[in-house]
């Protein structure tokens, strides 16, 4: 696992109901499945791209 300096916390704030299947898959890739869940991920360009794809469903809680 990466050190704490390269981690980002993401919280799901929106429902994937009636969303495109690719947006649902992106939430699964971000390890999110219910509103209010928070996950800590490595801060990489790939993860940032996934967050940008579903920016209306998630928010960044903490950037270290």
Swiss-Prot record:
CC annotations in GO: cytosolic large ribosomal subunit
Transmembrane intervals: none
Domain of life: Bacteria
Keywords: Ribonucleoprotein, Ribosomal protein
Entry's Gene Ontology BP terms: translation
InterPro entries (alphabetical): Ribo_uL30_ferredoxin-like_sf, Ribosomal_uL30_bac-type, Ribosomal_uL30_ferredoxin-like
Subunit note: Part of the 50S ribosomal subunit.
NCBIfam families: rpmD_bact (TIGR01308)
Listed name of the protein: Large ribosomal subunit protein uL30
Lineage of producing organism: Bacteria, Pseudomonadati, Pseudomonadota, Alphaproteobacteria, Hyphomicrobiales
């Amino acid at each position: 696992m990466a050190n704490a300096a390269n981690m980002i916390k993401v919280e799901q704030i929106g429902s994937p109901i009636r969303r495109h299947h690719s947006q649902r898959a992106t939430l699964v890739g971000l390890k999110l499945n219910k509103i209010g869940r928070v996950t800590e991920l490595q801060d990489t360009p790939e993860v940032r791209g996934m967050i940008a794809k579903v920016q209306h469903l998630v928010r960044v809680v903490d950037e270290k």
